[in-house]
Amino acid sequence: MLCAAGGTDRTGGIIHFYSASGRAAAGDLTRNIIGIILACIFGGLSVLHIYWAAGGRLGKAAAVPTAGGEPAFEPTTSTTLLVAAGLAAAMLIIFGGLGLFGEVVAPVTFAWLTLAIALLFLMRAIGDFGLVGFFKQPSDSKFAYWDTRLYSPLCLAVTLLAFVFLYLRP
């Protein structure tokens, strides 16, 4: 809520918003934007996994690590849907952290769950020192190519955004 007395302060070409408590509301805006970005990432990834579970093929060949030229595992429809559900849950946790569910669940619960998400994605970015992550063994597979250029950096970005989201928590 903006302060009724003054509301905004224009200094150096930058508008600063202050809440009634005097705290800059710009941090709240930044947190909301970060939350929306995280929710979109999780929602998009969830939809992609649902697409794969429904039989979609686009990008699927690059989604599973390979060992010796063969897929390291064969994801089943149920495990793919489980991953989609986990990503959808992460999206809902971020929405909860933004206050979209009111006071139904204590805000600290969403903070702890967001921390768990951040740590999970950090572990994924680091990897298993074998097939996935920044510290994987060198490979010329399609998965390794995309893991180095997209998957692991995205996991690290999600981690950093989640930590900033937590840091800016009111």
Give residue ranges: language-model regions.
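Individual transmembrane alpha-helices with interfacial aromatic-anchor signatures
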Residues: 81, 110-116, 141-158
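N-terminal signal-anchor transmembrane alpha helix
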Residues: 35-51
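Core segments of alpha-helical transmembrane spans in multipass integral membrane proteins
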Residues: 40, 55, 67-98, 115-119, ...
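Intrinsic-disorder-associated, low-complexity terminal segments enriched in Asp/Asn/His/Tyr and depleted
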Residues: 9, 16-18
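Juxtamembrane boundary at the C-terminal end of a transmembrane helix
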Residues: 164-170
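Transmembrane alpha-helical segments of integral membrane proteins
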Residues: 126-138
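Interfacial loop at the N-terminal end of multi-pass membrane proteins
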Residues: 48-83, 100-102, 135-142
